[in-house]
Amino acid sequence: MEMREKIAKAQRVVVKIGSALLTNDGQGLDVARIGLWVAQIAELRAQGKEVVLVSSGSIAAGMKRLGFSSRPTQVNELQAAAAVGQMELVGVYESHFEKHGLCTAQILLTHDDLSNRRRYLNARSSLRTLLGFGVVPIINENDTVVTDEIRFGDNDTLGALVANLVEADLLIILTDQQGLFDKNPRDHQDATLISHISASDNRLESMASGGAGVLGSGGMLTKVRAALLAARSGADTLIASGREENVIVRVASGEMMGTWLQPEHGRVAARKQWLAGHLKSRGALILDDGAVKALRKEGTSLLAVGVKDAQGTFSRGDMVVCVDLQGGLVARGLVNYSVAETLKLLGQPSSNIGAILGYKGEPELIHRDDLVII
């Protein structure tokens, strides 16, 4: 299926809009521009598409209302600005959507909400119900309570996690650039826009790790990482300029603009989709070459015999990452043994587990049902 056709057929779309596209150069919200975004989303809804909006802007809005002339540096002041600004942000959205006969819902999330399986399922159920009622959910990070997300977090990652959560067909990330370039366009006049790239392309891995100097500032770096995260659950991602007229409608109709990042694989099963988007790992298992091959080629469970080392502070049931001998990410999964137990089992066949630990638990460190290959 060609790009145009595949994108145009997307029925569940997540749209992420950053602060720079929602504000008047940091001087509060651009109410008129927000009205244009809302009109485009309303048009997608009129076409029968379900839309989830991931929107920044609460801190910028709160800064103006609290009288800050520049972005505060104190975390408590950022939290206060987020709390005040979120009220205005949601109010502006609600008033604009109401003009189009659409109902909205505010949802504030943290990474913890999506890394805990029970809370993840509750959030997914709520969002599915809202979409079933024709509501447009407006999602933001709960900056008032999550200090590290204010300092270092980004809504690109949140957009990818939400795409994972609602099993979206398409994630649209709007930015101040035309898309992803083969070189940093700020430094190289001959930089060429990458119109299409596969999530398995080695160039993306280099970009996502901060290498090659292609992306310049961290803004585009987070978008590449978000696209790779969305790709794990089978969602397509389009990175496009939010300055283009009617960009959301044009992109969703399949118009060739921006950069299309295509997932390597189709949608994964629901549990593995959660595992793929689970961010907070408690440790790492270092695998030998044989174990890496078995996981990638044969889809087996991870056995202790193929593990060279264990790092971190994980307990039974925690998320860990599996890496090869060079440190490359291979898989994520829920481990059956604590780090102390795992260290005792390194390189041992499953038949020795009972004798080593004094009890016989599961024969594998990570069962294949609790493992997702990256």
UniProtKB/Swiss-Prot annotation:
The superkingdom listed in its UniProt entry is Bacteria
Q: In what residue span(s) does the PUA domain sit?
A: 282-360
Single GO molecular function: RNA binding
Keywords, A to Z, come to: Amino-acid biosynthesis, ATP-binding, Cytoplasm, Kinase, Nucleotide-binding, Proline biosynthesis, Transferase
UniProt key word Membrane: no
Main EC class the enzyme belongs to: transferase
Q: Does the keyword Disulfide bond apply?
A: no
Q: Which InterPro entries match?
A: AceGlu_kinase-like_sf (IPR036393), Asp/Glu/Uridylate_kinase (IPR001048), G5K_ProB (IPR041739), Glu/AcGlu_kinase (IPR001057), Glu_5kinase (IPR011529), Glu_5kinase/COase_Synthase (IPR005715), Glutamate_5-kinase_CS (IPR019797), PUA (IPR002478)
Q: Where does ATP bind?
A: 16, 175-176, 217-223
GO BP annotations, alphabetical order: L-proline biosynthetic process
Where can this protein be found?
Cytoplasm
The principal location of this protein is: cytoplasm
Q: Report the EC number(s), separated by commas if there are several.
A: 2.7.2.11
A GO-annotated cellular component: cytosol
CDD domains xref list: AAK_G5K_ProB, PUA_G5K
Q: Specify which residues bind substrate according to the UniProt entry for this protein.
A: 56, 143, 155
Q: Which family does it belong to?
A: Belongs to the glutamate 5-kinase family.
Q: What is this protein called?
A: Glutamate 5-kinase
